[in-house]
Amino acid sequence: MTDIELDQFIAREPAAVWRALTDPELLARWWAAGDIKPIVGHRFTLDMGSWGQQPCEVLEVDPERLLSYTFAEGDLDTTITWRLEPEGGGTRLFLRHAGFVEGSAALTGMGNGWPGLLRRIEHALA
C-alpha cells in the first residue's frame, strides 16, 4: 500500500479552510458534492461524476485542526486525512490520502488530480 501526501498554503484563516472541507456547498465548489458533516461515525457519499457515488465515513474530527474519513469503501478502500496548521496570515493544509495499491491507476490518477484540487480551495472561499 502507498499514500499521497501533499500540502497547500491557503491565504485564509483555519476556520475558513475548515468550512471548505466540511460545508457541503463549499466542498462542491472545489471538489465534489456530498452530505459531509464533521461528526465521527457520520456516513456520507461524495458524487465523483463518472466514477459514481463514493461511500465515506468520518473517522476523526478535531475542529479546525483535523478531519479524517474513509473514501470509496468497497472500491478503493482508502482514507483521506486533512490537517490544518495556522501559518502566517493563513493556513497550511496537509492532505494524506492513504491505502492505495502500489502502482494502481487510482494512485496515479488521484496523485495527478489532488494538486489542482487543493489550489481550487482558496478560490472556492473567495
Q: What kind of feature is each model-predicted range?
A:
Residues M1-D35:
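Hydrophobic ligand-binding cavity/cleft-lining segments
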Residues A32-D35, H42-V101, H123:
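Hydrophobic-ligand binding "helix-grip"
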Residues A98-A126:
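A conserved amphipathic terminal alpha-helix motif
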